[in-house]
Regions:
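Extracytoplasmic/secreted proteins, especially bacterial periplasmic and envelope-associated proteins
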Residues: 10-13, 34-38, 42, 56-63, ...
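Acidic, low-complexity segments
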Residues: 214-226
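Sec-exported extracytoplasmic/periplasmic mature domains
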Residues: 7-8, 20-23, 43-49, 66-69, ...
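A conserved helix-loop-strand patch within extracytoplasmic ligand-binding domains
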Residues: 1-45
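Residues embedded in well-ordered beta-strands
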Residues: 1-3, 110, 123-125
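Solvent-exposed loop/turn segments at secondary-structure junctions
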Residues: 2, 7-10, 30-35, 96-99, ...
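Ligand-binding pocket segment of bilobal, Venus flytrap-like solute-binding proteins
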Residues: 45, 49-115
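Extracellular/periplasmic juxtamembrane helices and adjacent flexible linkers that interface
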Residues: 129-217
């Protein structure tokens, strides 16, 4: 999602607005941050899922990172850069992080929901090697089963995560409004394929042209997380 200054003074509503002249974007470094990687994937998908070619998407990604003002190593560092240091016009982040950021900066920030973004689904896994003890396995199974109950889905929604149950999501439409979300399979065959395609040594992110206009070989400074 996009977090912008109160009143959205730069008129940012959709992905193409991020590449306009003099727009300053904050996002974590895709080399070190899952949030940063999602920004890349969402930006790419915003082009190819709306009729653009991969050539168009590469051009868009190049223009986007030309407007990135700083690449913090993690999501929290990027949040601090945008909301505390007040650098940038727009911050790209997870929806739940955006909600927390706006709440923590009452009256100063607001969320913009672009027409389309990527569907990011946090995973939960059962690890056999850690659950050889029957009692521990029973507790783990109970927890996993609980996550899919209405009660747990309601808790998730209250913390800014979209429930997978439509009827529960509908009850939170004021804070989790409708938005078109494309799956990873719209831009790669799987998450593993996406990591290879975009973030390997020869991946798309590593091979898009660098911004030399600022006298540096990278798009923006690689800042350490805070």
């Amino acid at each position: 999602m996009f977090v912008v200054r109160k009143g959205n003074p730069r008129g940012i509503h959709d992905w193409p607005d991020l590449i306009k002249e003099n727009i300053s974007v904050i996002t974590p470094n895709p080399r070190t941050s899952g949030n940063g990687q999602l920004s890349v994937l969402a930006a790419w998908g915003s082009v190819v899922t709306r009729g653009g070619t991969e050539t168009d998407a590469r051009s868009f990604l190049t223009a986007l990172f030309r407007n990135v003002a700083a690449l913090d190593s993690g999501a929290r560092g990027a949040t601090n850069t945008f909301s505390v240091q007040r650098l940038g016009d727009v911050h790209l982040t997870w929806e739940n992080e955006a909600i927390n950021e706006v709440d923590a900066n009452k009256g100063e920030l607001e969320i913009v929901y672009p027409p389309v973004s990527i569907r990011a689904e946090p995973a939960v896994a059962w690890v056999d090697a850690n659950l050889s003890d029957p009692k521990r396995a029973a507790i783990a199974r109970a927890y996993l089963e609980y996550l899919f109950t209405d009660e747990a889905q309601e808790v998730a929604a209250q913390h800014g995560y979209r429930p997978f149950k439509p009827e529960i999501l509908a009850r939170h439409s004021n804070t989790l409004p409708a938005i078109a979300q494309f799956p990873i399979t719209a831009i790669a065959s799987s998450w593993d394929d996406a990591r290879q395609k975009f973030f390997s040594d020869n991946g798309i992110y590593e091979t898009i042209p660098r911004n030399t206009d600022r006298g540096t070989t990278t798009f923006a400074s690689d800042r350490q997380g805070r």
